[in-house]
Design a protein with these regions (language model features):
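Sec-dependent N-terminal signal peptides
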Residues: 3-12
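Low-complexity, intrinsically disordered segments with a bias for serine/threonine
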Residues: 14-17
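Cell wall/extracellular polymer interaction/catalysis modules
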Residues: 19-186, 193-207, 211-222
């Protein structure tokens, strides 16, 4: 009975969000993880049911590997996002196991967006591109909360907050001067300032961001 229920739920999801799923597939998203994330987003941990994101941290940095899945509007868009400095080189993340003890790695699994403290928001409010001199003002950030037993540690590390935020090392200027590469964060998910507010504002508070290594189950890296 449980297997039948899961199958029926998957069929309903596929038909209800056909456009978003087709977009995700075309854009190179890991589809097993996308489907897993959609199921997870229905849990009581997430108040936002109309939008979620999947970050395939295993793809090269030069790929648009952060997939914003808008279920309300039945579409998916793909964006650049940086990984943590302990995940690997600027070109590609290659280390995923050990994230629970290395805080400079992006935590894997289901994360929930939440309101960031004023000091955090202020820190990333204005970003300047060190290559082009372009300045972005009025940028927003969201705190990230771990909702699984293996990533809830990020909720209680003294003096450390995990955030989804903008930074210049994901910008078009950086990408032009460093082909195929992005800068690296201190364990946060970092976005291109040009599209940061579109993503952060759409996710709001209470949305799922699922950080995955391709289609692999997260348990493989615990």
């Amino acid at each position: 009975m449980r297997t039948l229920l899961v199958l029926l739920t998957s069929i309903i999801s596929a038909s209800a969000f056909a456009g978003a799923l087709d977009d995700a597939r075309t854009l190179g998203a890991p589809m097993q993880s996308v489907e897993r994330a959609i199921q997870l987003s229905r849990g009581k941990e997430f108040s936002r049911k109309d939008v979620l994101a999947v970050f395939d941290i295993s793809q090269p940095s030069g790929n648009r590997r952060f997939f914003l899945i808008d279920l309300k509007n039945d579409k998916t868009t793909a964006h650049y996002a940086a990984h943590g400095k302990s995940n690997g080189s600027n070109l590609k993340a290659t280390k995923f196991r050990g994230f629970r003890s290395d805080h400079d790695m992006v935590p894997l699994g289901p994360l929930r967006t939440a309101a960031a403290d004023a000091s955090v928001v202020s820190h990333y409010r204005t970003i300047s591109d060190k290559y082009t001199g372009q300045v972005w003002n009025g940028l927003n950030s969201s705190r990230l909360e771990g909702v699984a037993s293996y990533n809830s540690y990020i909720n209680s590390v003294p003096g450390v907050v995990w955030v989804i935020h903008p930074n210049w090392y994901v910008s078009a200027g950086y990408r032009k001067n460093n082909p195929g590469a992005l800068g690296r964060s201190l364990g946060c998910i970092t976005l291109d300032p040009e599209v940061n507010n579109v993503i952060v504002n759409r996710l709001g508070n209470g949305a799922l961001i699922y950080v995955t290594v391709g289609n692999d189950p997260v348990e493989r890296y615990l």
